[in-house]
Amino acid sequence: KLDEYLAHGLTHLNISVDSLKREQFQEITGVDRLPQILDAVDYAMKLPLMRVKLNAVLLQSTPKELDFFLEYVSTRKLDIRFIELMETGDNHAYFKQNYLPAQELITKLQSREWTTTPAPIGSGPAKMFSHPDYKGQVGVIAPYSKDFCTGCNRLRFSQNGALRLCLFGEGSYTLR
């Protein structure tokens, strides 16, 4: 299907991968599909896409897996973006148990000599980090940071097809 989407103008690909450890991925998602997803990522990188990005929700377990993510970008020219977990109306207990402030990940990256990559205006809310020994980059999307809304230029869709103009807003528009 990816070839078909490319023929119709696909230029970017974002894929959610909350863990690179198969067992942890299955625990988070409820499906054992990590090998197929990673095969699809490698296939997509061979196509003339402008950019491939992986998104992972930043959780308490992320620091234990940081080496797996960094190893993954060591040989692949792609971005892995960690998105700070947001508290919503229906995830208070999960949030309390799993929330990890983005600054903790940023501190770990900086201690390993990852440096902030200047972002062009309009590039979105991710704070990007690079390292001279790695082909890929690591991004951190921190909605609770002081300057998140200033750099946000995104519209978001829920899994139910509702358009959300703001992560912090309660309203949405059904597009179905």
Where are each of the predicted segments found?
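Radical SAM/AdoMet-radical enzyme domain recognition
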Residues: 1-79, 83
